[in-house]
Amino acid sequence: MIKTFTIILAIFCLLPYAGKAQEVEKSQMLDKGQLSQAFELQKENDSLYWLVATGGDKVNGWRLAYPVYQFQTGDVNGDGSQDMMVGVIKKTRFYPMGKRLFIFKQIDGTNKKGEVCKKVRPMWLGSKLGGILEDFRFLAPAEGDSMGRIRALESTTDSLYVVSDYKWSGFGMKFDHHIIKGVDKETATKYLNQ
């Protein structure tokens, strides 16, 4: 049963984006010489989105069958290419708090017809950062650093809030440092947005 579900899920997720979504939530464009990277988060309904890599004649999407609460772009891993950070609401068996951070990249590939196209592929489908994720934002690399950071607003089990920075560690996000901890949500939100 699990193997069948995994195979069906993998096949379904790899299908090229075939339909038009009802609305485009947000998009970001980056010009890199002759390569143009564009990303769109397209909403079909409250719990079905498509993360679409455009920038060419052919496009390919990644199906997100979860409500989305946040969408950001930036160079997470320092490779010079834009990545996509998507906040989804998805509970897991061992971690029922619903908000997650998924990170995607854009690659060149071919579709079933052998045509060159832009594809969306996951870099990290995280179940947890540190605390209970409430929100996040991408911070561009600091001077002298090649990697950006993800600043996360997290709640704690004692109803307080923490704002922390995370950096890419080769596979996934690694805690870097706290900005502030043990504060109310309003104070933490101010630090998240600094």
Model-identified regions with their sequence ranges:
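Sec-dependent N-terminal signal peptides
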Residues: T4-L15
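Beta-propeller-forming repeat regions
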Residues: G19-Q194
